[in-house]
UniProtKB/Swiss-Prot annotation:
UniProt protein name: Protein DsrB
Taxon lineage: Bacteria, Pseudomonadati, Pseudomonadota, Gammaproteobacteria, Enterobacterales
Superkingdom of the organism of origin: Bacteria
Family listed: Belongs to the DsrB family.
InterPro entries linked: Dextransucrase_DSRB
Pfam families for the chain: DSRB (PF10781)
HAMAP family for the chain: DsrB
Length: 63
């Protein structure tokens, strides 16, 4: 994924929410994505863990 990509994010107890990637930070354990959501237009950070399917919170939106 890249900055400005449309994505969906997994949140606690609700449906996936649509947003836009504002920034990306890579770490050895995975990748942090700053995603602008309707409720958080300045962005909120989500972490995708490497090698753990349950740890994937940000996915690229289907075209």
């Amino acid at each position: 994924m890249q900055v400005n990509d449309r994505v969906t994010v997994k949140t606690d107890g609700g449906p996936r929410r649509s947003g836009v990637v504002l920034a990306i930070e890579s770490f050895s354990e995975g990748t942090m994505y700053l995603v602008s959501l309707e409720d958080y237009p300045l962005g909120i950070w989500f972490f995708n863990e490497i090698g753990h399917p349950d740890g994937i919170f940000v996915e690229k939106e289907a075209s």
